[in-house]
Amino acid sequence: MRLTIRVIALTLLVAPVFAADHPDFRLWKADELRTRDAALSRKVGPDHSSRETLADFGDHRFRFLHRNADGFPEQHDNIVDVVFVQSGEGTLQLGGVMVDKKATGGAGEFVGSRLEGGTRHPLGAGDVIHIPATVPHAFLVEKGKHITYVLVKFPEQ
């Protein structure tokens, strides 16, 4: 009987060690994202956006962005964007021709002054978007509104 109690006690002590999450596991609960959303809305810069990196895993990263006006169009030749809209609303302008296209710091990274043509997709909380590499895109936000989203960036395979 004493041996059984000792085995059970030892099992209860050791079990949590084996049940621990992987060191790269991340979970952002809805309440935490709402708190971060509110904080970002108070830190909007001259470009009408604020952002933070939620996690960087080397080959991919999670960003959290808040915009209260149109963003500049961008294009990533080697990076795929996946977007999870957290709050607000806006429009994704996808494709078309990037006007005043300029290379930025990274290889295959470009920004422009606007997009001509392409398609427009209304966005709202809960929407999920996959933006392929090489496709120019911009997030548009009506005056007095905002859009906040989780952005996952990873290399095109």
Give each language-model segment a name.
Residues 109-129:
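Acidic, glycine-rich flexible loop segments
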Residues 74, 81-84, 120-121, 128-129:
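His/acidic/aromatic-lined binding-pocket segments of jelly-roll/cupin-type domains
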Residues 6-16:
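Bacterial N-terminal signal peptides
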Residues 144-157:
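A short hydrophobic beta-strand segment most commonly corresponding to one strand
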Residues 122-142:
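Conserved metal-binding segment of the jelly-roll/cupin
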Residues 17-77:
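A short, N-terminal "cap"/entry segment at the start of jelly-roll beta-barrel domains
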Residues 77-97, 104-114:
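Short, conserved beta-strand element in jelly-roll/cupin
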